[in-house]
């Protein structure tokens, strides 16, 4: 998306702002939203450290559309499918369409259920910034459940995070995006532009 044509970008579910900040560094005017106040505060801190004035971060539910339109909306790293009710996830896409300018582009990066079901790693552990982490994953009722636990000398007690994501396939997205008013331009299997396949 050239900056000259897609100046204003919304990062939907921005977390700690990793992608928002990269986009801002490339010259886009970026708004990042996330429900986590802690994540947004961290994103603001990093943006300030990098002296970026073309990015703002807001604590906001992705189901609640902003009262403005953007040239582009990005939803990256499977930041979708969090809600138990399918209708709520559909509403996220409908509201995303409302926030797009007439010639705007929506880019969504989402897992491939076929690949996940075949290659799910039930557990793993390692080190991250002097902390030990343990991750467990399971598939149940059409969702992936992930638990991440951090422990280490710098923590008073182990910190645990839980995530769940719906296993929506490509056909589901085609139907729901079409019903929401989107026209699908391309579907890729990776960031290099490879075709989407069952093993992507």
What are these regions (language model features)?
Residues 170-200:
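C-terminal lobe and adjacent flexible extensions of AdoMet/dcAdoMet transferase-like proteins
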Residues 1-4:
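Glycine-rich helix-loop-beta junction characteristic of Rossmann-like nucleotide cofactor-binding loops
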Residues 90-102:
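A short glycine-rich, Lys/Arg-flanked "PGG" loop and its adjoining helix->strand segment in the class I
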Residues 63-72:
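A short acidic, Gly/Pro-enriched loop at the edge of an enzyme's catalytic core
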Residues 71-87:
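A short SAM/SAH-binding and catalytic strip from SAM-dependent methyltransferases
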Residues 18-64:
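Class I SAM-dependent methyltransferase SAM/SAH-binding core
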Residues 6-13:
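Conserved class I S-adenosyl-L-methionine
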Residues 102, 107-176:
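SAM-dependent methyltransferase
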């Amino acid at each position: 998306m050239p900056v000259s044509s897609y100046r204003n970008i919304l990062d939907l579910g921005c977390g700690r702002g990793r992608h928002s900040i990269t986009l801002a560094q490339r010259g886009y005017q970026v708004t990042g939203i996330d429900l986590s106040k802690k994540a947004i505060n961290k994103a603001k801190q990093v943006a300030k450290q990098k002296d970026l004035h073309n990015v703002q971060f807001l604590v906001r539910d992705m189901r609640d559309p902003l009262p403005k339109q953007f040239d582009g909306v990005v939803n990256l790293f499977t930041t979708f499918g969090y809600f138990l009710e399918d209708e709520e996830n559909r509403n996220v896409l409908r509201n995303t369409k409302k926030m797009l300018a007439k010639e705007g582009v929506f880019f969504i990066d989402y897992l491939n259920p076929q690949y996940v079901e075949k290659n799910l790693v039930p557990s793993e552990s390692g080190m991250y910034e002097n902390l030990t982490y343990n991750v467990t994953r399971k598939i149940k009722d059409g969702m992936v459940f992930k638990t991440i636990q951090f422990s280490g000398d710098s923590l008073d007690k182990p910190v645990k995070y839980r995530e769940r994501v719906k296993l929506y396939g490509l056909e589901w997205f085609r139907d729901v995006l079409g019903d929401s008013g989107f026209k699908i331009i391309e579907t890729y299997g990776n960031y290099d532009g490879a075709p989407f396949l069952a093993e992507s």
